[in-house]
From Swiss-Prot:
Belongs to the methyltransferase superfamily. LCMT family. Residues 1-13, 39-52, 215-248 have a biased composition (Low complexity). This is tRNA wybutosine-synthesizing protein 4. Its EC number is 2.1.1.290, 2.3.1.231. It catalyses: 7-[(3S)-3-amino-3-carboxypropyl]wyosine(37) in tRNA(Phe) + S-adenosyl-L-methionine = 7-[(3S)-(3-amino-3-methoxycarbonyl)propyl]wyosine(37) in tRNA(Phe) + S-adenosyl-L-homocysteine; 7-[(3S)-(3-amino-3-methoxycarbonyl)propyl]wyosine(37) in tRNA(Phe) + S-adenosyl-L-methionine + CO2 = wybutosine(37) in tRNA(Phe) + S-adenosyl-L-homocysteine + 2 H(+). It comes from Neurospora crassa (strain ATCC 24698 / 74-OR23-1A / CBS 708.71 / DSM 1257 / FGSC 987). Residues 1006-1166 form the JmjC domain.
Length: 1213
């Protein structure tokens, strides 16, 4: 257990109150029949002095003062462990709660880190307990000794989790021994005695009489053969040790504290006893100074019955002995190896990349500030040094295995956690702090050492460490200019950077370059703004520290409107515009809205956000790259609400996002946070690289792929993949280690030429990325060979500045390359360093990348430009309230010279399903799709014959139909009438060309029950089947409706439930609009239908036509027999026959949880969701609350509320 999250209590400087071994202290066994003696005596130490427990004494003893500070930090550590216990182990008994007064939920990173720390220790202890021993070890009692235990509850957890392995209740079962400061052990003993849940599992409890015990009733204690109950425990002390030189004092009654809180603060009347203070069959407490190994061994010998050789030991030191002076800690390790058949589990910190690494420096600074420095890490900073530490101290003849926690997370042997267990962790709480978890886990190691090797387990397979220095990769030192940004300005991570150019108002019209870092996570919360930096000229001799801000010639502003606050989004440079895609609020709230940042007409300094086509599903940590010099982009992977997005999408400005067909035998692993870059552009194809990313099992994927995208048919793009082989340096050695350097999570991939690209930052599997390997220049040859050309190592150009920040942490940064000179700017970034503070990259660093061929140790020239932070600009969320200008068409419509607009309609993609999961994925994505090639039964071949259908239904069957006098029915104005007629007559009139429409209702109770084809038309229903690929529809069926129509349009409306429209006979043209278009299409409050005739209005010449063409995003599909249209909920749609008649089956199903739908009757499946109905009621109440205000004030505030609601709606994608 550790400090403010991270410090442990190892041992104390106090001497034992009784000389254990020379004079055995008196003990008491408490039962109903025997009460404790009420007398107390003053004990003396072995040097004849009277011990005291003076809280102020530590001021005179620096070593005692430091011990007290280490001991005091236990309280924070157990709060974090209690948070883990409650969240991650809901179905187990909870024991930390007895040591933590008030539950505090920690941040996900702290919870995940502490959970894994605890889990790794638990696995190694479990393995020790469950191992079947042979030979000399067979039959030996297993003893687990927790060195620096603090308030850990390992004994009770093991007794509850592994009762058979512990042989709970048996005298020769496993025994657990807690060792720590006497003062801390004293408090822990009191808690145990006062808590029935802790005392209950223990049998034959004995508390030595010199050990003070609480004056409150204790729990029931069950002995092996007799049940005994302690009814009242009062504070006592043993008689003086035989080593005392003074006569025993007259026993005095110990005063009872008035309340526990005061007692906890008051000095103890006697020193906390040293040695054994609590024993039972299963559990022992020893208060002891770990630097006094003689006393520790003496106490341990007594704890196990006097014969150490009859036991096999497991010593656990979870970040505890590292607070001791290193020689003392090493002595503990050496001593433990001398006890025969022993194991040692050590968990403590590492410095894998040295003390200057940003995480390491933050960690070391944290412990120094607490006056609890970790000492072992200076001598044993690496895995290799820890191995040698144990091998040279008595463990060399057995086996020593060391994992960093990051290695343990991904251990190929599933030693600690397997893929299914890693996946289950994501169900506990949303988690997206992977880089920070990797940094933490790379700076901690767990050692498992054994004095006796097990068969087949004596060696750990050495895999090597991915290190460019060891691989012999060339180095190029790149000069970096650093420009300071005062205060906390510029501190944001997981933002997105962009370079914008603006013309200067001067006569030369010189372009000014601006660098933006957009939104992201700030020091306290996600940010709704962006930082704007301006470029400044730097003289050859300039060594300025970057603190002077200059006024630049061109101001910078945003027009009102833009994306809502987010992080983990992307910005892709199209030259004249920037495409912002997705991102997230919390990890459970991904976003799907997309925006273009463009210069406004007639302005050189004003930029505006314009909403463009949304993603098919919300995504964050996706990978996006611009395709050559076009305005198209390729998107790969990303994280959705619950799953990783498996598809690749092409962004085409006029068509929106189009799913790519993944062809060929090589399929990429579904990941997020991967690196993606486009390197080459041909006439109708593009190619590039795709590497790494995090898969659904929580591991970084080992994938290095070259991809090729064919866009010869832009509506059906095809992408193929080829695996890449890595040549490391000039000799191609150690490919596996080189692959580890390239397969990253959270890195950036920056194209440099048709063959070269940079891999920048991020984290890698198993190991900490060395600071010299963070920026790699790579080259891709046409034969599929990938070479790491060289490592680019930043070397500060102005490191003489007293405020120079030192090494950067390349996590959450926004790397941007300027188009004019190829410089690489690094802005923002940093990480939460577990519980030890947050490291922020300061200022902005500029690397000159337009370099000649590199020579070893030859540095690049100093960048010629620096940067100043000009201002932070707010982004007002929501779309601009003004209507689009004439000839501006946000949906891709083209403006004509005469003012009319030619509407651009996006075709609905057509796909073939392989299985039911394919359809489930489509439903989750919530975008319309035409499904081809499904087997709907005999209906497709038979129902085109009207006579056949009439005979199947029954010619005299009465049905209610719509009879219209116009080609376009309007539900709002009811320009049709309901007519009851015979089905045979209806079919004859349809074939004759009458404007008729049938939407079948339930036969039995048409006003109460939804229609179901099998119930209402059983003879006809035998011809229609839902194919197995649509199993989800059948499982969640709400209704299935027969639809037959003549030459008449169905009005524009939306369905609250998802549905599949199965075209059986004839053909229809369907026009769909996304839900976000609802405000433009004439839907009255509470109405699900509109009076707009889309087919005449959208394609007309009127002002309404131009307006709709500009502001809506129509999608189109022509349905022919056998086609199935998936209609997501709330997509507005209308239809017109393209044949003389049409017949279809429309199947509705529930795609949301039941509680989302409104309660009560819903015959058509079209009743609005419960939240909307409640919202309308709330809206009326809110409006009524303004009735007493003057009319102008009422209008003013209601309009402001309406605007706020609108902004929230646009931001909550």
């Amino acid at each position: 257990m550790e400090t403010t999250e991270e410090v442990v209590a190892p041992a104390t400087t106090q001497q034992p109150a009784t000389e254990v071994g020379s004079a055995k202290p008196t003990t008491s066994t408490y039962s109903k029949k025997q009460k404790k003696p009420k007398a107390t005596t003053t004990t003396t130490t072995t040097d004849g002095t009277t011990p005291t427990h003076n809280e102020h004494a530590s001021a005179k003893d620096p070593r005692k003062a430091q011990d007290d500070q280490v001991m005091g930090t236990n309280n924070s550590s157990i709060v974090s462990k209690r948070s883990v216990e409650k969240l991650y182990y809901p179905n187990e008994p909870h024991f930390f709660r007895f040591f933590v007064k008030k539950f505090q939920r920690r941040a996900p990173l702290i919870n995940r880190g502490y959970h894994f720390r605890l889990h790794v220790i638990d696995v190694l202890v479990r393995n020790f307990l469950q191992e079947q021993r042979t030979g000399d070890a067979k039959g030996k009692r297993k003893v687990v000794v927790n060195l620096g235990c603090g308030s850990d509850v390992l004994p009770w957890q093991c007794l509850a989790r592994y009762p058979d392995a512990c042989r709970s209740g048996e005298k020769d079962g496993a025994k657990f021994v807690d060792v720590d400061f006497p003062d801390l052990i004293e408090r822990k003993k009191r808690t145990v005695l006062e808590t029935p849940e802790l005392l209950g599992p223990l049998t034959n409890v004995v508390v030595p009489e010199f050990a003070p015990v609480p004056s409150t009733p204790a729990a029931t204690t069950t002995a092996a053969a007799t049940t005994t109950t302690t009814t009242e425990l009062k504070t006592t002390a043993a008689t003086a040790s035989s080593t005392s030189t003074e006569a025993p004092q007259k026993p005095k009654k110990s005063p009872k504290p008035k309340d526990k809180s005061k007692a906890a603060r008051a000095p103890a009347p006697t020193t906390a006893p040293t040695g054994i203070v609590f024993t039972s069959d299963q559990y022992v407490q020893i208060g002891c100074d770990l630097r006094d190994l003689a006393t520790l061994q003496d106490s341990l010998t007594r704890a196990v019955g006097g014969d150490l050789s009859s036991c096999t030991f497991l010593f656990v030191a979870e970040v505890s002995i590292t607070y001791m002076e290193t020689p003392g800690a090493d002595a503990v390790i050496q001593w433990a190896s001398s006890l025969g058949d022993s194991e040692f589990v050590l968990l403590e910190q590492l410095l894998p990349s040295g003390p200057t690494h940003p995480f390491a420096s933050t960690m070391l600074s944290h412990f120094h500030k607490l006056n609890t420095p970790i000492k072992s890490v200076d001598v044993y900073p690496t895995v290799a040094s820890q191995v040698e530490r144990f091998r040279s101290r008595g463990w060399g003849s057995g086996d020593v295995r060391v994992w960093t926690l990051w290695e343990a997370w991904a251990d190929a042997e599933d030693t600690f956690v397997n893929a299914a267990e890693r996946r289950r962790l994501d169900e506990v709480e949303p988690f997206d702090e992977w880089e920070e978890f990797a940094l933490f886990a790379s700076h901690y190691c767990v050692v498992r050492a054994r004095t006796v090797a097990r068969d087949g387990q004596n060696k750990k397979k050495e895999r090597g460490i991915p290190n460019g220095r060891e691989l012999g990769l060339p180095v190029e030192k790149v000069k970096v200019r650093w420009d300071d940004v005062p205060g906390q300005r510029g501190q944001r991570r997981f933002a997105a950077g962009a370079v914008l150019t603006s013309s200067s108002p001067s006569s030369e019209k010189k372009e000014e370059v601006k660098l933006l870092n957009v939104m992201g996570l700030g020091t306290k919360s996600r940010l709704q703004n962006c930082d704007v930096y301006g470029r400044k000229k730097v003289g050859d001799a300039d060594e300025a520290d970057g603190t002077d801000e200059e006024k630049t010639a061109v101001p910078f502003t945003f027009r009102e409107g833009g994306p809502s606050t987010r992080m983990c989004h992307s910005l892709t440079d199209f030259g004249t515009a920037q495409l912002l895609v997705g991102g997230r609020a919390s990890p459970s709230t991904p976003l799907k809205d997309c925006w273009l940042l463009e210069k406004t007409n007639g302005s050189e300094s004003e930029w505006a956000w314009k909403r463009t086509n949304d993603l098919p599903i919300p995504l964050y940590r996706h990978s996006v790259t611009r395709l050559g010099k076009t305005d198209m982009a390729l998107l790969a992977g990303g994280r959705g609400v619950a799953d990783i997005f498996p598809d690749w999408l092409l962004y085409e400005p006029k068509l929106g996002w189009i799913r790519c067909e993944i062809a060929g035998d090589v399929k990429p692993t579904s990941v997020y946070g991967a690196t993606l870059a486009c390197l080459r552009q041909e006439s109708d194809s593009f190619s590039g690289v795709f590497t790494g990313g995090l898969s659904d099992d929580g591991l970084i994927a080992d994938q290095l792929l070259a991809w090729n995208l064919d866009v010869s048919n832009s509506s059906r793009p095809v992408v193929t993949f080829v695996p890449l082989q890595v040549k490391s340096g000039d000799d191609g050695r150690e490919e596996a280690l080189s692959r580890l350097l390239l397969t990253r999570f959270g890195a950036s991939c920056l194209p440099q030429s048709r063959t070269d690209f940079l891999v920048f930052g991020g984290v890698i599997k198993d190991h900490l990325l060395d600071m010299e390997d963070e920026i790699l220049l790579c080259s891709l040859k046409g034969d599929g060979e990938l070479t790491i050309t060289r490592r680019l190592v930043p070397e500060a150009a102005n490191a003489k500045s007293p405020s120079h920040p030192g090494p950067l942490l390349l996590v959450g940064t926004s790397p941007v390359v300027t188009p004019d000179d190829g410089s690489l700017m690094i802005v923002g970034g940093g990480a939460t360093c577990f519980s030890m503070g947050t490291f922020w990259n300061k200022g902005i660093s500029t690397l000159e990348l337009a370099l000649p061929a590199a020579v070893e140790n030859e540095a690049s020239p100093i960048p010629a430009y620096g940067w100043v932070h000009e201002k932070t600009v707010d982004i007002i969320p929501g779309e601009p309230r003004s209507l689009p200008l004439r000839n501006q068409a946000p949906n891709g419509a083209e403006g004509n010279a005469n003012g009319s607009v030619s509407v651009r309609i996006q075709p609905i993609p057509r796909v073939r399903l392989e299985n039911a999961e394919d359809f489930a994925r489509i439903v989750r994505e919530g975008r319309p799709v035409v499904l081809e090639g499904l087997n709907l039964g005999d209906c497709v071949s038979q129902w085109g014959n009207g006579d056949y259908v009439a005979k199947k239904v029954g010619t005299d069957r009465k049905v209610v139909i719509h009879e219209s006098t116009t080609p376009a029915m309007d539900f709002t104005t009811k320009n049709f009438r309901y007519v009851t007629t015979e089905f045979g007559d209806f079919m004859r009139r349809v074939e004759k060309g009458d404007r008729l429409y049938l939407r079948a209702l339930s036969t039995d109770k048409p006003t109460e029950k939804p229609a179901v084809l099998s119930d209402d038309f059983p003879s006809l229903a035998t011809d229609f089947v839902l194919p197995p690929e649509l199993a989800l529809v059948g499982d969640r069926l709400f209704s299935s409706v027969l639809r037959v129509s003549g030459p008449v349009n169905m009005w524009l409306h939306y369905d609250v439930m998802a549905n599949v429209y199965c075209q059986i006979g004839g053909s229809k043209r369907m026009i769909l609009f996304p839900p976000s278009d609802v405000e433009h299409l004439g839907f009255a409050p509470g109405a699900s239908s509109s009076s707009i005739d889309v087919f005449s209005t959208l394609f007309g010449e009127s002002s309404d036509s131009r307006y709709l063409a500009q502001v809506t995003h129509p999608h189109e599909a022509v349905m022919t027999p056998g086609d199935v249209l998936f209609l997501p909920p709330l997509w507005l749609h209308t239809a017109t026959p393209t044949s003389d008649s049409s017949i279809a089956v429309n199947v509705f199903f529930r795609d949301l949880e039941g509680g989302c739908y409104a309660a009560g009757k819903d015959v058509y499946g079209n009743r609005d969701l419960a939240a909307y109905e409640k919202g309308r009621t709330d809206l009326t109440r809110i409006a009524n609350s303004f009735q007493k205000l003057p009319a102008e004030a009422r209008e003013f505030y209601l309009l402001r509320l309406a605007d706020e609601l609108r902004r929230k709606a646009k931001g909550a994608q």
